[in-house]
Amino acid sequence: MEVLLGTSALEPRSYLVTVTEHLERLGHEVRVFSAEPLPSPEELRVVGVERDLPLAPDVIYSQDAEAALLLAHLYPLTPQLFATHGDRQDVWLPPQLAGVVARVVVFDDRTGERVRAAALPQQLIRLRRPVDLDRIVARGELPDRPAKARVQLDGVSDYRRGIVQRVLADARIELDDDADLVLGRGSAVVEALAEGRAAYVYGDDGGDGWVTPERYELLEADGFSGRAEPSATTFERLRAELEDYDPALGPAGRELAQAHDARAHAQELLAAFDEVKPRRDPVDAPLRELARVVRLEAAAARRAHTHAREAESARTRATELERELAEVRERNEQLAREVEELRRQAEEAAALEEQRLERQKSRRFGPRR
């Protein structure tokens, strides 16, 4: 089978690499389409609108709305599946246009609910986030107390990141990739489980704590996003839960990761590919223009997100500077009080010295006449 993976900019990279490798292991030919011209990573065979497009792939597996629309235009009769990688950004949702995609793959129940809430009904395929258990080897026995932590918080606010840094510093835990525990969300948690490390779910919207066998189903259904339970992750809570670290979480996590085996994921994808049939008619819509609009909207959303992060960082820095300024002012006032006290003491000492000298003169020369 010839499979064309559709992307706008080769994202999400780790998923593309994992799926491509395991489909190719089974003898299938895989190319990755990138709407944006980008350098081709060694692990992927990248094609674009202007170069090396396959003549007639058997199936298209798109990872975002822009790629789905553009490839539906380029291959009007080729069946297409769509992978929804999250519920936060609209670009991850399938196009709300009948006939563009035949099936939608979701990786957690939360995202599935988001897709079902959209106007266009979709047939969903529920898979788990894959991890390459052949490539990732368990690190071995964990220590009784954690000494090193890996923090994977891409896109998390400075405030939330700061809580983690303060907690780890208070617990005397160093930052190191060769860690005993991992704090993160999504695929970072799945990889931590596969590595046999203790995994703590923590993101911008909350923290759900340690991934244990008892809580795995709840946290996996939520996509390890940190939003499974409505609770606030304060410094005090995170610091207290860090004390619940258990070295047994390592081997237990490796066992839980078996449910995310990339080999099984590839086989489930192929079964879904076999089920879809070619379109009988092309989609009657200006697909290329819609793809352009989606691309511009996604770019605007990214810029807005970047500006929001920068504004938040600026506010955080302004708060820090205000606190530092207040501390400097308080210190200056304290120093001014100390200087004033020293001046008073000096004046008193000078007055006493003058009195002493006067007494000495009186004793030596007698009273003035």
Pin down the residues of each PLM region.
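Boundary detector for helix-to-coil junctions that initiate low-complexity/charged tails
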Residues: 279-369
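A charged, aromatic-enriched C-terminal amphipathic alpha-helix characteristic of glycosyltransferases
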Residues: 118, 228-288
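Short His-centered aromatic/hydrophobic patch
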Residues: 61-67, 84
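A short, active-site helix/loop in glycosyltransferases that binds the activated sugar's phosphate group
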Residues: 91-92, 102-122
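N-terminal strand-loop element at the rim of the active site
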Residues: 5-54
